[in-house]
């Protein structure tokens, strides 16, 4: 059942230079649709950041929050209809002035709609990738489905997308890293799990790898393989393969895997070079990678919301890519004998041995 509740956004005075009215208006309701229950930590953190910033800026519109309660990828056939039901409810009563989608599944369900309310109502998104896949028809076998990757910046001109904060995954920069460290690499093994996020990331990687016909792409796909099967495949990968880790939370058994399973995958082939496109495996398995700088985007979305609905100019922020950066595990680099390789400028280094002063900065000097 769809989880729904109302939040009345009360205006509070925080030292603004002009007097503010402590009131709530129902004119132009803001509708926020989340992929998961709002009590889920990632959703809750972003909603809290949104509410705090919106109130701080002086926003006073009624905010309605709906949850799609999405679970496993196997139920993806249901998401489009769930989204349609939510939108139809508001289309019959009072259409919102803005729709905000939080989460990959909610966003995919929204851009899979053909209704007027979906295409005409101003929309924003957060906690999503710049690259996505449109949900399939009911007859499609999701295990075998090979969708095309869509780009939010190019492929949805018929939707009224006024803003959003999106993660951009960069295959090119990670391939360049692999070649810098392993110039004899001939194959790339990409790991993705049995989630919508894993599937959309796999579709994007397949699209990008067409630029590199000289490299063979191997898919370690959680939709078709269990954790043990993926582990066994990793065990037998040859020395001309580099691994690119995408996502790894759920395998084909639809059971959530424990966080320490990536340690098991590492130990299945300890000399296998591994890179990460989404920070999974950093700190114990991956050598490094170019990844988005993940953070709560609720504050930024609130700012864009206020500027669009309540600002003097009604400005559109547009879709904003969340910055990315290079991250490397110094300890892993040393274990693989890669200390002497020049790293990209500005790279973040983790597991770095602290210097003498840093180790003993809290010690009290003794004067003899």
Feature roles, as predicted:
Residues 5-13:
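Sec-dependent N-terminal signal peptides
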Residues 15-17:
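N-terminal signal peptide c-region/cleavage motif recognized by signal peptidases
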């Amino acid at each position: 059942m769809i989880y729904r509740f109302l939040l009345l956004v009360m205006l509070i005075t925080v030292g603004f230079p002009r007097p503010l009215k402590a009131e709530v208006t129902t004119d132009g309701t803001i509708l926020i649709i989340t992929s998961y229950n709002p009590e889920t930590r990632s959703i809750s953190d972003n909603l809290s950041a949104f509410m705090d910033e919106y109130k701080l800026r002086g926003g006073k519109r009624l905010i309605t929050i709906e949850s799609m309660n999405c679970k496993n990828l196997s139920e993806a056939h249901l998401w489009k209809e769930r989204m349609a039901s939510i939108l139809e409810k508001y289309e019959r009563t009072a259409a919102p002035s803005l729709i905000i989608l939080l989460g990959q599944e909610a966003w995919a369900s929204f851009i899979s709609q053909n209704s007027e309310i979906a295409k005409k109502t101003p929309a924003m998104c957060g906690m999503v990738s710049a690259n996505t896949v449109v949900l399939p028809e009911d007859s499609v076998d999701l295990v075998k489905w090979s969708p095309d990757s869509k780009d939010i910046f190019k492929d949805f001109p018929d939707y009224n997308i006024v803003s959003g904060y999106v993660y951009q995954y960069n295959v090119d920069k990670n391939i360049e890293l692999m070649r810098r460290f392993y110039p004899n690499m001939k194959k790339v093994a990409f790991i993705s799990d049995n989630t919508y996020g894993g599937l959309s990331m796999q579709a994007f990687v397949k699209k990008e790898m067409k630029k590199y016909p000289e490299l063979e792409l191997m898919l370690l796909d959680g939709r078709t393989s269990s954790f043990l099967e993926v582990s066994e495949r990793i065990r037998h990968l040859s020395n001309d393969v580099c691994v690119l880790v995408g996502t790894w939370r759920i395998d084909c058994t639809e059971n959530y895997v424990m966080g320490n399973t990536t340690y098991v995958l590492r130990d299945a082939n300890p000399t296998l070079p591994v890179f990460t496109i989404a920070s999974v495996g950093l700190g114990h398995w991956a050598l490094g990678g170019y990844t988005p700088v993940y953070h709560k985007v609720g504050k930024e979305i609130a700012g864009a919301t206020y500027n669009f609905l309540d600002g003097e100019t009604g400005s559109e922020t547009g879709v904003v890519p969340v910055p990315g950066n290079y991250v490397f595990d110094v300890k892993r680099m040393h274990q693989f004998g890669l200390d002497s390789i020049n790293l990209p400028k500005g790279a973040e280094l983790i597991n770095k041995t602290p210097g003498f002063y840093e180790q003993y900065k809290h010690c009290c000097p003794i004067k003899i």
